[in-house]
Amino acid sequence: MNISPQYLWNQVLERLQIRLTRPAFETWIQDATVQEWKDNCLVIQVANSFILNHLQKTYQPIIAQEVASVVGYPVDIQLTTAEGETMAMTGEAQSYQEKSLTQIAPESPKLNQLNPRYTFSRFVVGPTNRMAHAASLAVAESPGREFNPLFLCGGVGLGKTHLMQAIAHYRLELYPNAKVFYVSTEQFTNDLIAAIRQDSMERFREHYRRADFLLIDDIQFIEGKEYTQEELFHTFNTLHEAGKQVVLASDRAPKRIPTLQDRLISRFSMGLIADIQVPDLETRMAILQKKAQYENMRLPRDVVEYIATNYTSNIRELEGALIRAIAYTSISGLSMTVQNIAPVLNPPVEQVPASPEVILRTVAESLKVSIEDLKGSSRRREISFARQVGMYLMRQHTELSLPRIGEEFGGKDHTTVLYSCDKISKLQQKDWELSQMLSELSDRINMASRTQS
């Protein structure tokens, strides 16, 4: 059959898109490109060795099947990366579905603790969570193989619980009878305490050690719980030796959990530790747009950018701000504009400790006045306003008393400082442009302070 490599690969992609789940296709297959097809060998380039290895281990049969179905005969397939790493796809073209089915036991307890919104399709992937997402999908597809245990690590509200529950949803959608246990550390401990009180430890151990998939959230709360650590150690060993998948989530790496037994640190670190960082601006905007889509809302771009710019610490705060904005505009009947939502949201300003000199210099440069003007007694409107802004920001970013702030501004009285701070605080609740300006000034002060430290 005389067809071009690109046409062949496009046909294969169309077929794979139908056969695979959307998260699986978008994570592993979608960005792969065809490099060459000659001498009955199709060369496919992928982004990195992580994807290359997973395709070889998990998707070799289904890719081989679809390539053969397009050209009409078996074809050798070689995977490569831009760095030159290569791997041949070899082995029997066993059915992808048949291969997975052999790993699952026929019965499973009911699982009623999952949030229906926490699925892979609703998880927004960005540079700061891409590895964690890919690893989570990998263990959901092929448990007990590459990353066991998988340890998700990141701050509060960054998506660890979402990914853990997405793993559980994925397995249960494919295999409703799979024994998938998703619990918090608190629940695991409470179950253990109840078993001790009821003299039913054997039942407790049997329950957790028959899992095909054990996902434990907030594992940092195991700190100081010696007996819980003891039971978890033996449960982990039993499951791991049986090839069952364990997934753990924490706000810190295993070695940073106080009083965690060394043997548990070793076990938790033997698989993959996938870190999740604060999402960047583009990812935060994408999260808001997807959230609005599920709420059947169309958000103006400037509103999305305003919320994403001002809520940077975690996803929960970000989505909470959007919900407040939607609720306010719905109840008030106002249109969704930055001017209308800014006073209601009143976004938090990160306060990095800063020196008075940094604050004075930042305000002077940004508002086009001199430091001498800020410390002087001029009552010109633009200078007086800049001075009030400077006093407000100095109160936000330092621990200085009102009299000390007054001294930094040329010996002003503490009542003048208090008046200025109150005035700016009240104005920003009504004036979205002022609120935005204060946020930008705080960001500049933060950046300058971090550079100095």
Curated annotation (Swiss-Prot):
UniProt-listed Gene3D superfamilies: 1.10.1750.10, 1.10.8.60, 3.30.300.180, P-loop containing nucleotide triphosphate hydrolases
Annotated GO MF terms: ATP binding; ATP hydrolysis activity; DNA replication origin binding; lipid binding
Protein name per the record: Chromosomal replication initiator protein DnaA
HAMAP family from the UniProt entry: DnaA_bact
Keyword DNA-binding: yes
A cellular component annotation (GO) from this entry: plasma membrane
GO biological process: one example: regulation of DNA replication
